[in-house]
Swiss-Prot record:
The active site is at 82 (proton donor). Binds 1 zinc ion per subunit. It catalyses: D-tagatofuranose 1,6-bisphosphate = D-glyceraldehyde 3-phosphate + dihydroxyacetone phosphate. The gene is gatY. Forms a complex with GatZ. Gene3D superfamilies: Aldolase class I. This is D-tagatose-1,6-bisphosphate aldolase subunit GatY. Belongs to the class II fructose-bisphosphate aldolase family. TagBP aldolase GatY subfamily. InterPro entries: Aldolase_TIM, Class_II_FBP_aldolase, FBA_II, TagBP_ald_KbaY/GatY, TagBP_aldolase_GatY. GO terms for molecular function: tagatose-bisphosphate aldolase activity; zinc ion binding. One of its GO terms (biological process) is D-tagatose 6-phosphate catabolic process. GO terms for cellular component: cytosol. Catalytic subunit of the tagatose-1,6-bisphosphate aldolase GatYZ, which catalyzes the reversible aldol condensation of dihydroxyacetone phosphate (DHAP or glycerone-phosphate) with glyceraldehyde 3-phosphate (G3P) to produce tagatose 1,6-bisphosphate (TBP). Requires GatZ subunit for full activity and stability. Is involved in the catabolism of galactitol. Dihydroxyacetone phosphate binds at residues 181, 209-211, 230-233. It comes from Escherichia coli O6:K15:H31 (strain 536 / UPEC).
Length: 284
C-alpha cells in the first residue's frame, strides 16, 4: 500500500527525532518534483493541497495521480488536506479516499475551535483518517485564508493540552512566530514556548510557515518536538522565478515540456534542502 496515512509517518518521526516535510503542490510538474526527489532520497513526504489546489486539479484526479506516482516509484506517499475549513468539503474528500486532514478553525474563539475540530475528528476517525488542527494563528496568507500580522497570536501551552484532550486530534499545529509567505527579515521564533508546549502535549507537533527559515531554526524546532514541517511559498517562488527567467532568456520557447524543466530544477533544489534539513533522508 503506497498511499498511506500521515499518522504512522508522524509517529515514526516523533520516535526517530526527525520531521516529515509536507510540500504544497499545484499541478503535475510540482507533484513530479516532490515525488521524484523524495524517492531518490528515500525520504517520507506528505503531498499537501489547499482547497484551491483540490479545486484546480480535481479531488479524484489528484488522488489518482498520487496513487499512480506512489506505485511508479515504489515510494509511500501521504496526501493531506491543508488549511481546510468546511466540514462538508472535508467529508466529501474523505469519502473520496483522502486519509489526512487539517481542519483550520484557529480563527474561532477557543471553545468554538474545539467544537468545530471535534466534529471533524469524530467523523474522520470513523474512516481511520488522521486529523491535524491549529491552536494560535499565523500571520500572512494561505490560499484564501488571510490573517493580519497584528491579529496573529501564539499557542498557549496550557490551552494546548486542553485542546488536544478535548478534540482527540492526532497532531497539533502550533504558532511560535512563523508566518505564511516569505520573510522580509528573519523571524524570532519562540523556542521556549515550543519547549513548554512539548511538556504539556505528547502529540506530534506541526510547524506551518517554514518557507525561508534557516536550517538552524528548522533543526532546533525538530529537537523541541516538531514532527511535520510545512513548505509552500518557497516552492512556488523558486518554480515561478526560474520559469520567468527562462522565458525572458528564451522568448522563442513554446514547448512546456522544455521550458518547465528549469522551473522544476529550481524547485527540486528547495525540496532536497528541506528534506535534508528535516533529517528524514533514508527514513522511508
Amino acid at each position: 500500500m503506497y498511499v498511506v496515512s500521515t499518522k504512522q509517518m508522524l509517529n515514526n518521526a516523533q520516535r526517530g527525532g526527525y520531521a516529515v516535510p509536507a510540500f504544497n503542490i499545484h499541478n503535475l510538474e510540482t507533484m513530479q518534483v516532490v515525488v521524484e526527489t523524495a524517492a531518490s532520497m528515500h525520504a517520507p513526504v506528505i503531498i499537501a493541497g489547499t482547497p484551491g489546489t483540490f479545486t484546480h486539479v480535481g479531488t479524484e484526479n489528484l488522488m489518482a495521480l498520487v496513487s499512480a506516482m506512489a506505485k511508479q516509484y515504489h515510494h509511500p506517499l501521504a496526501i493531506h488536506l491543508d488549511h481546510h475549513t468546511k466540514f462538508d468539503d472535508i467529508a466529501q474528500k474523505v469519502r473520496s479516499g483522502v486519509r489526512s486532514v487539517m481542519i483550520d478553525a484557529s480563527h474561532l474563539p477557543f471553545a468554538q475551535n474545539i467544537s468545530r475540530v471535534k466534529e471533524v475528528v469524530d467523523f474522520c476517525h470513523r474512516f481511520d483518517v488522521s486529523v491535524e488542527a491549529e491552536l494560535g494563528q499565523l500571520g500572512g496568507q494561505e490560499d484564501d485564508v488571510q490573517v493580519n500580522e497584528a491579529d496573529a497570536f501564539y499557542t498557549n501551552p496550557v490551552q494546548a493540552r486542553e485542546f488536544a484532550e478535548a478534540t482527540g486530534i492526532d497532531s497539533l499545529a502550533v504558532a511560535i512566530g512563523t508566518a505564511h509567505g516569505m520573510y522580509a527579515r528573519a523571524p524570532a521564533l519562540d523556542f521556549s514556548r515550543l519547549e513548554n508546549i512539548r511538556q504539556w502535549v505528547n502529540l506530534p507537533l506541526v510547524l506551518h510557515g517554514a518557507s525561508g527559515l534557516s536550517t538552524k531554526d528548522i533543526q532546533q524546532t525538530i529537537k523541541l518536538g516538531i514532527c511535520k514541517i510545512n513548505v509552500a511559498t518557497e516552492l512556488k517562488n523558486a518554480f515561478s522565478q526560474a520559469l520567468k527567467n527562462y522565458l525572458t532568456e528564451h522568448p522563442e520557447a513554446t514547448d512546456p515540456r522544455d521550458y518547465l524543466q528549469s522551473a522544476k530544477s529550481a524547485m527540486r533544489d528547495v525540496v532536497s534542502k528541506v528534506i535534508a534539513d528535516c533529517g528524514c533522508e533514508g527514513r522511508a
